[in-house]
Amino acid sequence: MCLSGGRFEFGVGAGWNREEMANHGTDPRRRMAVLQERVEAMKAIWTQDEASYHGQHVWFDRIWSWPKPAQRPHPPVLIGGNGPGVLDRVLAFGDAWFPNYAPEGILDRAAELRSRADRPVELMVMGVPADAKVLQAYAEAGFRRAMHWLPLARRGPVERALDRFEAAVAEFDGE
């Protein structure tokens, strides 16, 4: 049985709102370690018929969970974030880096990630502007997907934003 036809991707991030994390029971000072263990635990559940995981923050014995994901060995894990340790997290337990767009630094960090990786790491970016030159620069740096934020507004402004992004994509594609 496969619910998504093998299209599921598991996107995670360590978070930024410390008050919200504390309100949900996560000590913000330990969030990076908690995130890593939670991802490792999910990988155990996805890949083992009878999964156990014993970490400092996540601990369980002999659980069963089905259906298993269609992707082997597990769905891609997309690590979001722009913080100083994000590349280490991608290399430790991720399959892709999914930063927020920033006009400076992301392309250099993508090159650093690729040079440090001993395996393919997918690159995608969230929040790009409607600008063909930006899309081109990210594509040349190895980014394969770019997401564009839409305004929280009525239909007219949203449609205009979509039109601008569509025009940028068309210019980037050479249409």
Feature names for model-found ranges:
Residues 1-175:
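Active-site-adjacent structural elements that line small-molecule/cofactor binding pockets in enzymes
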